[in-house]
From Swiss-Prot:
This is DNA topoisomerase 4 subunit A. Residues 35-498 form the Topo IIA-type catalytic domain. The active site is at residue 124. The lineage of its organism: Bacteria, Pseudomonadati, Pseudomonadota, Gammaproteobacteria, Pasteurellales. The gene is parC. Its EC number is 5.6.2.2.
């Protein structure tokens, strides 16, 4: 509800006003600022720039004029907005690295791929329209489009331009409206024209038929489009998605040469990103980076590997994953349709709707020409009458006060015919020749018949449109720039893979303090420990391997050895790096390659085989690895040397069982299977436990020590202890039940 008070001020509720104002602003930005029209593929500011330049006579063959002159005309006549925004829109249409088919031909500094906004001010640059702008302008003035008043009502401007090709797909566009945006990628003119022709020949063709012609977007760069065909099809079906581009490179004399970057990637930014990683020592395999770009090679980035042993494919895959050498581009084909409503459209819908636009435009052009031809034929008919009665016509003109009315009455002429006769100069009237008039009449009559035939036949109209599309495509054609190549996904090299693998020893103390020493030739027990502390365990491995800690509850934790303090100190408590369950203590330290198989077991007699990678848990709380029966404890992990290894299990009751390791299940975690029978009640009250667990080859001997007693069991002696997994085993010789030490003697 609104009302006007006595002071002439309109009043309305604030809510109503704000809703109305926001809606009006939203519709204005969507319809008149940010989104392109499907017919000519231009946003209003772009259309006004192109039209203003054509009105200034700045076609492709004209002399260049100051850009400020064009911008002034655009702002003063059609687009009452900021000059910088208008000039920037003009610059984008002139940059060959921004527009696939630039509409403006610029002279001067119009920016560079490294910094598109480094263009000179409009008072310094000069411009004119490019040759390809003809596809938008050539049919103006032929009745093809409707005109509308400009912002102050003093001039008229076209509502849209009569595009002869689907420019909406050729150059694409980007824009941000209110509540919506548009990102339409550019395409190759040959492919789009061929697809349009195919749809004219076969209106029932589907998207798959179109995609046999249109490979995908074609950006103004020779970088590769690496999106799979299935993804590209989905984008063209739904009108939205993401396109991924990757730089092109080659090896040359041991160096890596990057010759093309993804669309809108800055060479200086890419170099800075790589240099930053080199400074942070994250690219030890790379020695140097150079920018060797020149006028012949706008993009030439040289990477120098540290040696010829560097895996260049892995290096580039890492750079693709971590720098702008690989970029993704949002696709959102949102535009104003022929129904003057914004909508996201698929490729097939865009092409079919543009062909409807083109049919309307060509029909209007032909009808406009037909009207002109009919008008001229009508005039010629009057001139022929004048020729046949030349003396009488001259007499009427000389002596009558109103010669026009007399001519119309005497010879039954129309108003237009009489005006045409009277407008002829006397010498032209005297020189009228029947042959000339007849020839022009015959020529125009043929044109009339042809125009009426085309306008009366949809097939002939489509044939004409097809011919014009093919001629224009041939005139402005150029090869595809962005090749479509399916590549493997870029993978970042982990820090551990890039760090040189050095031998390290990780030492754990009784009180849970940990440290890391370089090399394997140290004696962990001889190191200095805190008062009341002493050596508990250690593990040897490489600096690029994880170090795993196993606690008394059966949980495992992993840390990077390089994150541990040096062995020159007394270390740091593990409780500051790991979150152990209440009452739990770290029992063992393990290092191995990720695929190394290990035997995990509890002293209740259960065990299983797992890989070292199954022990790795990067979170501070670790992961549940071994499920322990009640009161059971974890045994030290054993390294499985080969698949034929034998498991030697010895209980505190003096029973020994030997069985193949391959009889144990391979698990990533769990309780495992029974290795040797220990009554559950005995295991629970810990009256009988698994005390010794070994892995040996089938040719190994065992030396048993108990106090001063020593017994050697050779392979043939061990045969009587071999049985199926889970059996009770056989009793060891007397005297080997307590304080037992065992040494494995491999052949």
């Amino acid at each position: 509800m609104t009302n006007i008070n006595y002071e002439g001020i309109e009043q309305m509720p604030l809510r109503t006003f704000t809703e109305k104002a926001y809606l009006n602003y939203s519709m204005y930005v969507i319809m008149d600022r940010a989104l392109p029209f499907i017919g000519d593929g231009l946003k209003p500011v772009q259309r006004r720039i192109v039209y203003a330049m054509s009105e200034l006579g700045l076609n492709a063959t004209a002399k260049y004029k100051k850009s400020a002159r064009t911008v002034g005309d655009v702002l003063g006549k059609f687009h009452p907005h900021g000059d910088s925004a208008c000039y920037e829109a003009m610059v984008l249409m002139a940059q060959p690295f921004s527009y696939r088919y630039p509409l403006v031909d610029g002279q001067g500094n119009w920016g560079a791929p490294d910094d598109p906004k480094s263009f000179a001010a409009m008072r310094y640059t000069e411009s004119r329209l490019s040759k390809i702008s003809e596809i938008l302008l050539n049919e103006l003035g032929q009745g093809t489009v409707d005109y509308q008043p400009n912002f102050d009502g003093t001039l008229a401007e076209p509502q849209y331009l009569p595009a002869r090709l689907p420019h909406i797909l050729l150059n694409g566009t980007t824009g941000i409206a209110v509540g919506m945006a548009t990102d339409i990628p550019p395409h190759n003119i040959n492919e789009i024209a061929d697809a349009a022709v195919m749809l004219l020949d076969n209106p029932k063709a589907g998207l798959d038929d179109v995609l046999e012609i249109v490979q995908g977007p074609d950006f103004p760069t020779e970088a590769e489009i690496i999106s799979p065909k299935s993804e590209i099809r989905k984008i063209y079906e739904q009108g939205r998605g993401s396109i991924k581009m990757r730089a092109t490179w080659k090896k040359e004399d041991g160096e890596i040469i990057i010759s093309a970057l993804p669309h809108q990637s800055s060479p200086s930014k890419v170099i800075a990103q790589i240099a930053e990683q080199m400074t942070a020592k994250k690219l030890p395999m790379l020695e140097d980076i150079r920018d060797e770009a020149d006028h012949e090679n706008p993009i030439r980035i040289v990477l120098v590997p540290r040696s010829n042993r560097v895996d260049t494919d892995a290096l580039m895959a890492h750079l693709f994953a971590t720098t702008d050498l690989e970029k993704s581009y949002r696709v959102n084909m949102n535009m104003i349709g022929l129904d003057h409503k914004p909508a996201v459209k698929g490729l097939l819908e865009i092409l079919n709707e543009w062909l409807d636009f083109r049919r309307t435009t060509v029909t209007r052009r032909l009808q406009y020409r037909l009207d002109k031809v009919l008008s001229r034929l009508h005039i010629l008919e009057g001139l022929m009458i004048a020729f046949l009665n030349i003396d009488e016509v001259i007499e009427i003109i000389r002596h009558e006060d109103d010669p026009k009315a007399e001519l119309m009455a005497r010879f039954n002429l129309s108003d237009e015919q009489a005006d045409a006769i009277l407008n002829l100069r006397l010498r032209h009237l005297a020189k009228l020749e029947e042959n000339q008039l007849k020839a022009e009449q015959d020529e125009l009559e043929k044109e009339r018949l042809n125009l009426e035939a085309i306008l009366g036949s949809e097939r002939r109209l489509n044939t004409l449109i097809k011919k014009e599309i093919q001629e224009d495509a041939k005139k402005y054609a150029n090869p595809r720039m962005s090749q479509l190549v399916e590549r493997e996904e870029a993978k970042m090299i982990s820090e551990s893979d890039m760090t040189p693998a050095e031998p390290v020893t990780v030492i754990l103390s009784e009180m849970g303090w940990v440290r890391c020493a370089k090399g394997h030739d140290i004696d962990p027990k001889s190191l200095s420990y805190k008062a009341g502390d002493s050596y508990l365990a250690h593990a040897c491995g490489k600096s690029n391997q994880a170090v795993v800690f196993i606690d008394s509850t059966g949980r495992s934790y992993a840390l990077d050895p390089l994150s541990l303090p040096s062995a020159r100190s007394q270390g740091e408590p593990l409780t500051g790096k790991l979150n152990l369950p209440t009452g739990a203590t770290i029992e063992y330290v393990v290092m191995a390659s990720e695929q190394q198989e290990l035997l995990m077991a509890s002293d209740a007699g259960y065990g299983f085989i797992c890989k070292f990678e199954d022990l790795i848990a990067r979170n501070k709380a670790g992961k549940a690895l071994i499920s322990l029966p009640e009161n059971a404890k974890v045994l030290k992990p054993k390294t499985l040397i080969n698949s034929t290894a034998l498991v030697v299990a010895i209980t505190s009751a003096g029973r020994m069982l030997i069985f193949p390791a391959q009889d144990l299940p391979v698990l990533s975690k769990g309780k495992g299977n029974k290795m040797i029978t220990i009554p559950a009640a005995n295991a629970k009250d810990r009256s009988e436990l698994l005390t010794k667990l070994l892995l040996i080859s089938d040719q190994a001997s065992l030396e048993f020590y108990s106090g001063k007693r020593k017994i050697v069991l050779k392979p043939e002696d061990l045969q009587k202890f071999r049985a199926e997994r889970g059996r009770k085993g056989s009793t060891l010789p007397r005297g080997l039940h307590t304080n037992l030490e065992i040494m494995v003697i491999e052949p």
